[in-house]
Each structure stands twice: as C-alpha cells, then as structure tokens.
Amino acid sequence: MTLQEIVDRSRRIVFFGGAGVSTESGIPDFRSVDGLYHQQYDYPPEQILSRSFFDENPAEFYRFYRSKMLCPNARPNAAHYKLAELEQAGKCTAVVTQNIDGLHQAAGSRTVYELHGSVLRNHCMRCGRAYGVEAVAEAADIPRCACGGIIKPDVVLYEEGLDQQTVEGAVHAIARADCMILAGTSLSVYPAAGFIRYFQGEHFVLINRDPTPADKLADLVLHQKVGQVLSQIQVR
C-alpha cells in the first residue's frame, strides 16, 4: 500500500516528528557536531544543554544556545504546511514533535504537542514573568528579567522531565489514532522514543533518511527526506 492510499483510508492521523522535519528549514540537528564546533566550545552539546550546566554556567549556556538553538530566519517547509493542510481537512488529529522551533504552529497546525518545549516561550525563574524569544536573542549576555531574575527558555534540558500535561495529550492522541506517521527521528531519545508503543492503530508509516530500530515494526518505510515525501500527498 502506498502512502497516498494509507492517507486516503485514514481518519485520525497522528504525526510524530523529530529533528529531520526541521533540517529542511535550515535548522541543524545540534547532535551533528562538526570540526568547527570543537574550536568554539569546550563541552559536548549534551552537557551544555543540561540543567546543571545551565545553573552553573548560564553565560556559556546562552553563548551556545543563541548560536546553535535559535534560528530566527527559519521558515516552515513543505512537511509543516502539508500537516497543517491535513489537519484543516480533518484528517490529522495531532502533531507530536521533539522539535523546539515552533514551525508547526507557524505553518498553521493547531494541535501540537511539543515534548521538548519551545524556544519561543521563556520565563523568569524568580517571578515567573513570561517573555518572547526576543528577550533571549537580543540580550548581550545572560538574559535577565526586570526583577533581576534569570530568564530561562521553556525548553526541556537534559536532566529535566517532560511536561506531564503535554505527555498525556500526546499519548492520548497516539492511542486513538488509526495511522501514525513517524518521521525525521532516529528514535534515540528517550522517553520520547517510547511513545510508539501506545499506537494501536492500523497503519504505521516511517519516514527517515537512515534506518531506525522501528523499521521492522512499520507497514511502510521510506528512507527519504520528510518534506519531499509529504509534499507529494494529495489531501482529499
């Protein structure tokens, strides 16, 4: 069965996406460390993006975060727009994403569960005041609130747990879906990778450039770029 046939037959599609969905919008996967990286930073990205590092070295955290995690010029790609179109047509019931860029909402998707939070939301750790991304992007050093507290991104760092409400919403959507499209993720990040076990539906589709541990479970496996594949779907 082709992806088009699966989409045509499905009424409750849930899309689960990882970094590979956003790379086509020019957002690099921070795990793909290049040679230049080691000239700029003394620590691996996983260490810099940990809660203990944030607490102990906020200046170094923000130097990395502003340079590598904020991509102000990124725009939604074909995958984001197609998913918004599928939602509008009543076919896609939810997008569950490991990405923190807000591009699904920018493309028009409304029901989006951001497992790892969003760079667009930030808050003061002292008084709780909410800030947009500009407060972080435009700060010269450590972004601070008017009260003097440090502003922290609403992004799930290593050593932090996922937001329980977001997890419950995602699990509920996956459990009710008749089709799950898993895309742009190597399934290496837990607990997010464990979400697929809640899927009880009929069609499990996997789109990823490289093979994943879940390939053998899928009804259809496409080793291609996500935007390339989704852009070909006719919504009808």
What are these regions (language model features)?
Residues M1-R236:
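Conserved catalytic core of sirtuin-type NAD+-dependent deacylases
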